Every structure is written in structure tokens, then in C-alpha cells.
């Protein structure tokens, strides 16, 4: 069996050399990333046996990570794996080795903030590959990135030292926000880092269904929302698109902790942002409204139900269907899911526009029948039809019969042409 000192020699004794490709890691970088992954397993599974080596390995990994340029994609896996190892140490019995003020300051300055920076390849995905960007940024994907590992490192450090970590790291949040305020158009990336850092400091527990469920008591989420998030929503479209997306994502994350009286201002702003020419912003705006409509009170009643939603219903439909009509968003699952959610929550308050809504849905079905698209999008289209019929049946069964007449020819065509098997 290969000994632990052997691995140490491989980490500390080899010069960091990348491959010829500037974007992809060479063999040596891959090996070092794998070694860091193995070290993480040692710390997690065999902490007692590994205890004599933790200090040396931690120093070796630290030296390795801090001389890497995190802006280069080829180092992403190594940075992520290395920070995972430090995260595991921060959670275990050796956590005191990372708890000193100087250590925390160095970690924040040299690892966390640099690895939370918006990189060139992030900008490319944001503009040219929005699906990939959203999958990595908004959804609970299993993608391992240096940015996600930096956030996990912050959360790991909080486990045994929450008050001190929060105090030290929060000072950097303030510095970043002050830098942004001095020149928003040029320093937008500083606020982007601040958004990610405050989230890593604040979130203590979360679920996919509810978003954040518990928070760090030392982080004033309400104050940050009012001072830094709501102001960005109101500044649209005169602020940077990445900051627009960050603000909407923050609301998605902390939706269960926001009071009902904040929802109208959020929804009003988000409706406008659905029309953004930037696909990520339009998608986040739709996701923001949709997820707010899923928030429940302790008694399971909706925090923002049909009556509260009514003033916004038709503006939401106008914005969502209008954006779906554009070629770049015609198969956007977030917009379609929003339409489905509003139909479900509105409880029949769409009667006056129901025929127009059904016409829009039928037109979409006719289009996707010819060229099936994203499965989730197709699913939400048919769910929307079902919601519309269901919510109106008790009020006007004759209207549902009209809907059947509108949609049956299309459905018959699907069966006759055996579209599903093509």
C-alpha cells in the first residue's frame, strides 16, 4: 500500500506545470487534483490515523493553491479539490489550525475572494451559453467548480467558529460593496463577489423546495435585501446584467425568509426584467416570480396567494408570452413554468383572458409537435393547459368545452402522426 508520505512528496515536491492547452488541465494538474481528492477522503474517513500529517499536507495544499491563477479554467478542478480538502479539515478535530484571525484573513484574501471572481469563461457562458451558466449558478447541480468550493470552504470554517468567521469575512463584503458603489459600471464584479460571499456566510440550511430555511444569526439578511438587492431591482435596466441576475438569484435563495409585504415590489420589478434581452436575466426573473409563488406559511397557506397576485396576473402573462415569442427564448422552461404556476395559483382569476391564453398555448403546442424541444418545457406547456381547464371548469364548463374544441385537432394530429415516437 502506498504510504501517506509518498503522497506528500507528490504534492510538495513537483513543480506546478500545466499542459500546453490554456483551457484544459494537463496530466500533472489532473494528478494533483486527484491527490487532493484522496487527501480529502483520508481526512474524512481516517482522521485519527491521518492526524500526524494534516499540518504538513495543509501547508502543501495551501502553497499549491495560492500560486495558481484562478482566472484560468485549466486550474478549476485542482482549486476545487484543494479547497475541498481544506473544508474537510475546517469541519474536523484539526479545525483550530484554520481558526486564527491571520489564517482566516489569508484564506479570504488569497483563496475565497479570488475564486469567487467572475471569470472570462463565466462571461462567455453568461452571454453565449446561458443554459450552461444557469445550470451551474442557479440550479442545485453537482458541478464542482472553484467558486462552489470557495463557498463550501466559508461554510466549513463557520462550523466551529461562526462569529469570528462572520466578523472577518463580513468586513470584506463591506469593502467590496464600497468599491462597487464608487464606480458601479466598472466595479460590478466586486458586488458579484459580495453576493456570493454573503450567501456563503448566511446560509445554514436549505432545501430545493423552500430555498434557504435557516441562516447565520450574525448576518442581517433583511438589511442586505433592502439596501443591496431591492435597490438593484429598481435600478434596472441601468445596472450590469450580472448584478441583475445576482439580485434575482438572492431572492430565489432567501425567498422563504422574505416578508409578504416585500413580494409586490419584487414581482413588479421582475416582470419588467422578463423582457430583458439577456437570456439569463429573463430566465432568473421568471424563476424568481415562480418560486415566490411556491412559498408557504407555517399553516401551509400561500404567502402570496390568488388575491395578492391578481393585480400582476396579466402583466406577467404579457411579459412571459412576449418573451417566449422571441427566437432566443421560445423554448425557455423557466418562462413556461412561470405561466403554469400563475395559472395554478390564480384560481380562476384569468377568465377574462382565458381564450387568449389558450390560443397562445395551442400555438406553442403546434410548434413543439413539429420539433420536440426540451422535455421540461414540453411538460410545463401541457401542465399549463391542464391548470387552465381545471381552474375554470367550476366557473364556466362551457368555456372548457371551447378549449377542447381548440386543442383537440392538434392532439388528434399528434396521435395520427405518432409524433412521440419520432
Regions found by a protein language model. Give the residues of each.
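Karyopherin-beta/Importin-beta family HEAT-repeat alpha-solenoid scaffold
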Residues: 1-422
Amino acid at each position: 500500500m502506498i504510504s501517506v508520505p509518498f503522497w506528500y512528496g507528490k504534492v510538495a515536491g513537483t513543480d506546478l506545470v500545466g499542459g500546453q492547452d490554456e483551457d484544459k488541465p494537463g496530466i500533472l494538474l489532473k494528478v494533483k487534483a486527484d491527490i487532493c481528492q484522496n487527501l480529502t477522503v483520508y481526512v474524512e474517513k481516517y482522521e485519527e490515523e491521518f492526524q500526524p500529517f494534516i499540518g504538513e499536507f495543509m501547508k502543501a495544499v495551501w502553497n499549491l493553491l495560492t500560486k495558481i491563477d484562478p482566472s484560468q479554467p485549466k486550474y478549476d478542478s485542482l482549486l476545487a479539490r484543494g479547497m475541498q480538502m481544506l473544508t474537510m479539515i475546517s469541519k474536523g478535530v484539526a479545525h483550530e489550525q484554520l481558526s486564527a484571525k491571520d489564517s482566516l484573513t489569508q484564506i479570504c484574501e488569497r483563496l475565497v475572494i479570488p475564486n469567487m471572481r467572475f471569470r472570462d469563461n463565466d462571461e462567455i457562458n453568461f452571454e453565449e451559453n446561458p443554459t450552461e451558466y444557469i445550470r451551474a449558478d442557479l440550479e442545485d447541480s453537482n458541478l464542482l467548480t472553484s467558486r462552489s468550493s470557495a463557498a463550501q470552504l466559508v461554510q466549513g470554517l463557520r462550523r466551529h467558529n461562526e462569529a469570528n468567521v462572520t466578523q472577518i469575512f463580513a468586513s470584506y463584503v463591506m469593502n467590496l460593496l464600497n468599491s462597487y458603489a464608487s464606480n458601479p459600471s466598472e466595479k460590478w464584479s466586486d458586488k458579484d463577489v459580495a453576493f456570493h460571499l454573503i450567501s456563503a456566510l448566511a446560509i445554514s440550511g436549505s432545501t430545493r423546495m423552500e430555498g434557504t430555511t435557516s441562516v447565520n444569526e450574525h448576518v442581517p439578511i433583511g438589511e442586505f435585501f433592502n439596501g443591496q438587492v431591492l435597490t438593484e431591482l429598481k435600478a434596472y435596466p441601468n445596472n450590469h446584467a450580472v448584478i441583475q441576475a445576482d439580485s434575482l438569484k438572492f431572492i430565489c435563495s432567501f425567498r422563504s425568509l422574505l416578508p409578504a409585504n416585500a413580494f409586490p415590489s419584487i414581482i413588479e420589478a421582475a416582470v419588467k426584467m422578463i423582457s430583458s434581452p439577456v437570456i439569463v436575466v429573463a430566465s432568473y426573473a421568471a424563476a424568481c416570480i415562480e418560486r415566490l409563488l411556491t412559498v408557504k406559511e407555517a399553516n401551509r397557506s400561500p404567502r402570496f396567494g390568488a388575491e395578492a397576485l391578481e393585480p400582476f396576473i396579466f402583466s406577467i402573462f404579457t411579459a412571459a408570452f412576449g418573451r417566449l415569442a422571441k427566437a432566443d427564448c421560445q423554448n425557455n422552461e423557466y418562462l413556461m413554468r412561470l405561466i403554469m404556476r400563475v395559472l395554478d395559483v390564480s384560481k380562476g382569476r384569468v377568465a377574462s383572458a382565458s381564450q387568449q391564453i389558450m390560443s397562445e398555448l395551442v400555438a406553442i403546442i403546434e410548434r413543439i409537435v413539429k420539433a420536440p424541444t426540451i422535455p421540461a418545457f414540453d411538460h410545463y406547456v401541457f401542465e399549463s393547459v391542464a391548470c387552465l381547464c381545471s381552474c375554470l371548469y367550476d366557473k364556466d364548463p362551457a368555456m372548457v368545452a371551447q378549449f377542447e374544441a381548440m386543442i383537440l385537432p392538434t392532439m388528434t394530429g399528434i396521435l395520427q402522426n405518432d409524433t412521440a415516437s419520432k
